[in-house]
Amino acid sequence: MVESEKIKKAYPDYKKTVCVDFDGTICKWAFPEEGALQEGVKTALQFFKAMGFKLIISSCRTNKKLNPKVYKQQVRIIRDYLDKHEILFDEIDDGEQGKVVADYYIDDRAIRFTEKKGWLGVISEFVNEIQKDE
């Protein structure tokens, strides 16, 4: 049984989900401002919706540990940005539920783990990424 089938069995109302990061993924990195829309993002998210996926937008902006006074305002800021650019989405993670349950995560800062690559492969990719940042 694949992971999404296990999730569906445990949570009957679950819909296959893509969780997409906001800063650096949907828009160019400009925090605390909102950057320009990334090229192709609108088409990509329309594609995921057409495939039947639920779209959840996630952002560290909504993490109340980073700034407890403004994290809820960030949900509104993200929603306004998405509406302004006519970006399709189902919900914005408000940071209250913990990690978003999703089948796929799209993020500009992710390093993907696979059993084939293993942890040595993750370390190698990590080292390459931090060397690019220096």
How should each PLM-predicted stretch be described?
Residues M1-E134:
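HAD-like aspartate-dependent phosphatase fold
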